[in-house]
């Protein structure tokens, strides 16, 4: 796909569970090549939103579109990266990366070529025959990233992918993820509880409101890359987002 032409859009999307309003009238757009982070207090609907976009659930009302086409279910145009890795323990690193390609019916030689490309991209070529229980948490998450990219999705959906990692590994994985994003030119929609992570990664930060189950604020992050967490402007933006989240928590 031409990286200058794609977009992903939510139009007035709502989700209700047995009378409980999880989301109410959510609208926003992710543009081609854009890195968007979603933040907000617990219970504001971040994970529900991601499940709707992934096609794992259907909205009660509203429309989700990819390049103008309505999303009605899961599809290979959306790649998922999970916090809990979700790797098959009986498959090698290569086998996990090739799983989606097998479902597509690609020949073994084609699968191997694609897997090798993404093994190299995430720096795991020497571990291609290893099993998940032989890998560190950061390495497992790299496998998850490679598996998502191997299917060549238009957008990557990431649900707290680094939340289970220690602080040092998490920072390292953020750097790695940015490098991969720059290389692949994918749209990224990244859910996180960490405001610091959102400010470090995102072109745009979407703050969800637990009060209204909607988007409270969309903040454009124009801090130059590479970003310095100790920089005054970085700290200022982080504090601005934290202040709004604290207001949401206080309301609840």
Report each predicted region and the residues it spans.
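Helix-to-loop junction immediately C-terminal to a conserved catalytic motif
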Residues: 54
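Conserved ABC ATPase "signature" region
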Residues: 102, 109-127, 179
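Conserved signature/switch motifs of ABC ATPase nucleotide-binding domains
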Residues: 130-133, 151
């Amino acid at each position: 796909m031409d990286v200058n032409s794609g977009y992903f859009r939510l139009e007035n999307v709502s989700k209700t569970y047995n009378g409980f309003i999880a989301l109410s009238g959510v609208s926003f757009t992710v543009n081609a090549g854009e890195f968007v982070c979603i933040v907000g207090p617990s219970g504001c609907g971040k994970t529900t939103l991601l499940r709707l976009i992934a096609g794992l659930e259907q909205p009660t009302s509203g429309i989700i579109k990819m390049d103008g086409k309505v999303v009605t279910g899961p599809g290979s145009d959306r790649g998922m990266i999970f916090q809990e890795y979700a790797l098959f323990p009986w498959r090698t690193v290569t086998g996990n990366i090739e799983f989606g390609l097998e479902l597509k019916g690609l020949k073994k030689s084609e699968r191997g070529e694609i897997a090798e490309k993404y093994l190299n991209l995430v720096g795991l070529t020497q571990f291609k025959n290893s099993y998940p229980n032989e890998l560190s948490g950061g390495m497992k998450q790299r496998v998850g990233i490679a598996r998502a990219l191997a299917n060549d999705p238009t957008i990557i959906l990431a649900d707290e992918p680094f939340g289970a990692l220690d602080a040092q590994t998490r920072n390292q994985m953020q750097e790695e993820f940015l490098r991969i994003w720059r290389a692949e030119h994918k749209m990224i929609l990244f859910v996180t509880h960490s405001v610091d992570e959102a400010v470090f990664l995102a072109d745009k930060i979407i703050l969800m409101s637990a009060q209204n189950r909607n988007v409270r604020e969309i903040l454009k992050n124009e801090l130059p890359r590479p970003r310095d967490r100790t920089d005054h402007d970085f700290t200022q933006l982080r504090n601005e987002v934290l202040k709004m989240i604290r207001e949401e928590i206080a309301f609840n």
